[in-house]
């Protein structure tokens, strides 16, 4: 291969060409010749480094003349300084120029050499004339300028020294940190080396022990000649291999497990490989030793915690235990239960099977899905003051509706917004003082009692409206009973005070007859005279409500998941299911997933009582909620859940309960069943609703029932009225789980249908003595029964026998009295009662007998107890339950 360079670029250029910089790249063409007649032309460029030369390097002889010229070019004004008498101002003026161009300071500029250059220019001579003609003021000004320049130079010098000192400190600190890091790295390296040596020694020791445990090698003479020849061939070095050592096996490419603290040295150390721990080596040696010795370890059984619901199939139980379904069926067969793999067993049987297989059991019920639905009680520090919730109750003709309308007119926010646009059953009134009051409209008191029946306390204060000209009416008394049953404070608003026949004193006296003691008579019930027609006393009523709320200290936590109650619900044609919600605590927001009774949904919109869309609603704020799957019932508690799956689970359980209740408990609840429920709940009060034909009979019945009460049980009359049994009476009885007693009265059709649907029992009487006897019997059933023991006999244990199916059986001799099967027994050891239970087996000569007389021998076994010893005494007795009754 030959190279041919083109040097045409190196020829001298024409003289008439424009001047330019000298090129630093020389290019040429080279042709490369290859075999088989192939060639290739290549462009070759040669780059030269351009060096910049100063005038001093180019012409050394002209250096003395160039230096004064440079000094004159950079600092022309300082050169004229010798010609001026005031030397100080002229010397100080070029100070900034000298600072900006430090090169001038390095080049000497003597005055004799610079003076002739300045004298050649006439402008310098004129400048000297100007300086000689300066006035005193100008001289002083220049002197001050020079002084300030000197001060600035001093400050700059001090600042530079401070910067230099700080930089020196930083350098020293960084040097110290580097030294400390180096020391730590050295320490880590030494520790790593020590750990490596320890692991190496442990591995060598383990290998030595493993070699010692292996069986001795077979002698060469005993092995076949072929195997020996093969080994000899293996021992000979391969051709061309020489004495090259054997190639090490490839290292494991897995990452090293980090031990201890990660340091910079460890992070950048790629040579270190993951090493086996000492415990791992020991486990490996132990496994190999057992393998050589032929020891086989049985697989260890895994004990699991099995969650068992109320009912479960055999297949599901086996899956949860990770066992075979056949094994589960075998255990059931041993117990005499023949079932298929798809059959359902109860939780008790499933627990026995799981415990038989060695697993632990966790019993759960369907009602567990509601656990955690209602949040825990809030701490006092998180609670904030909220608006009171007020329910207005009273007779329909006493101005309750007029009072509600008048209170709406006092709402300043409603006046600004143009009035309330719709009525949703609950609304807020914004007072001029900035306070807020939430009013709950409960026509007919139906929603009020249904809320109380579900255990929800929504109302904080009850405002009882009584007409001053009409006094206390039957529905007023019913409203009083509702307020007492709810256990909330009451404020009496005496309405229609603008009429001339108004008599507030009469109203107060009539209230006193129904155990409502007003403040004027020494009680704690506040009274406010008002007039809904003229607006008189409304401000006083609002102040009284706020005062009562302040005494109650009504507070709630707004910073949590919302909880509230459904005031009313309806199915709107355009918007779907709509529920009016009164938030009790927390904040309800758009997008929350809520559960209300047996319905759930995601909040699509919140509408306040003025028809405005809002993003959230805090405590005591009533809003309409859109987005529920169906219309809930009034009084249902609303809760916010974390997911749709949880909401579906809760609502499915509640819907199943409602369906089972409709199917299974369609009949009426009897008085005996209701009393048994009351006993189970440890209630010592018997609630009753009494309706009579005349007021005298009603008062006589109430007095007779009050005399039946004792220290343990008493009759609580919720409501006494004159006239037939109405639907409102049934509603009150449903909420309180009370029977209705009718004396010479009957229930109308609506009340009978409501009682049949709600399961309320209505009893009719015409003789007061029969009524009192039945109530006395019902109250006697609420008393706890008396237990009386009757001694039967004693037996001494002579011997203990172990029976495969039964367990331990005690061979006894009856020493006193008689022993009966199924009676209660006590096991006495050293005159101390060890166990108390029942006899499960009583045998005589392998035959089951009912009783064994004194002096005879028999076999006994206890229910669920096996710790019996020779010499123990068995005491047999009967327990008699004696029902107590009122005297």
Swiss-Prot record:
Residues 531-533 are annotated as: G5. InterPro entries: EF-G-like_DII (IPR053905), EFTu-like_2 (IPR004161), IF2_assoc_dom_bac (IPR013575), IF2_II (IPR044145), IF2_N (IPR006847), P-loop_NTPase (IPR027417), Small_GTP-bd (IPR005225), T_Tr_GTP-bd_dom (IPR000795). Residues 419-423 are annotated as: G2. Belongs to the TRAFAC class translation factor GTPase superfamily. Classic translation factor GTPase family. IF-2 subfamily. It comes from Parvibaculum lavamentivorans (strain DS-1 / DSM 13023 / NCIMB 13966). It is found in: Cytoplasm. The keyword Protein biosynthesis applies. Residues 394-401 are annotated as: G1. The keyword GTP-binding applies. This is Translation initiation factor IF-2. Residues 148-178, 185-194, 201-215, 267-276 have a biased composition (Basic and acidic residues). Residues 1-291 are annotated as: Disordered. Keywords: Cytoplasm, GTP-binding, Initiation factor, Nucleotide-binding, Protein biosynthesis. Residues 441-444 are annotated as: G3. Residues 495-498 are annotated as: G4. GTP binds at residues 394-401, 441-445, 495-498. PANTHER family: TR-TYPE G DOMAIN-CONTAINING PROTEIN, TRANSLATION INITIATION FACTOR IF-2-RELATED. One of the essential components for the initiation of protein synthesis. Protects formylmethionyl-tRNA from spontaneous hydrolysis and promotes its binding to the 30S ribosomal subunits. Also involved in the hydrolysis of GTP during the formation of the 70S ribosomal complex. It comes from the Bacteria. GO terms for cellular component: cytosol. Residues 58-117 have a biased composition (Low complexity). Residues 385-553 form the tr-type G domain. GO terms for molecular function: GTP binding; GTPase activity; guanosine tetraphosphate binding; translation initiation factor activity.
